[in-house]
């Protein structure tokens, strides 16, 4: 009886940890460091940088704190 309870608890914990979609929102890369996009660093170069560090893809978008500045963002590895 106790082993069944522990197996169910283990299953719930693993399913929560392995649920896809938890890291699909764009985040600055690396966290805390904003790479500005502009004439010298385009969306194509941002994508190349992000895929080189192991992320799925990258793109340039307005910065969260300063919307007038465009920053490089990467999608999570999931």
Curated annotation (Swiss-Prot):
GO cellular component, one term: extracellular region
Record keywords, A-Z: Antimicrobial, Disulfide bond, Fungicide, Plant defense, Secreted, Signal
Principal place of residence: secreted
Signal peptide extent: 1-23
GO terms, biological process: defense response to fungus; killing of cells of another organism
Domain of life per record: Eukaryota
SS bond list: 37-60, 46-72, 50-74
Keyword Signal listed: yes
Subcellular location: Secreted
Family statement drawn from the similarity comment of this UniProt entry: Belongs to the DEFL family.
Protein name stated in the entry: Defensin-like protein 281
Organism: Arabidopsis thaliana
């Amino acid at each position: 009886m106790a082993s069944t309870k522990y197996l169910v608890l283990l299953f719930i914990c693993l399913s929560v940890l392995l649920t896809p979609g938890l890291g699909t929102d764009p985040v600055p890369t690396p966290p805390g460091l904003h790479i500005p996009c502009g004439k010298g660093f385009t969306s194509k170069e941002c994508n190349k940088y992000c895929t080189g560090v192991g992320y799925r893809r990258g793109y340039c978008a307005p910065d969260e704190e300063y919307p007038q500045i465009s920053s490089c963002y990467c999608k999570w590895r999931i």
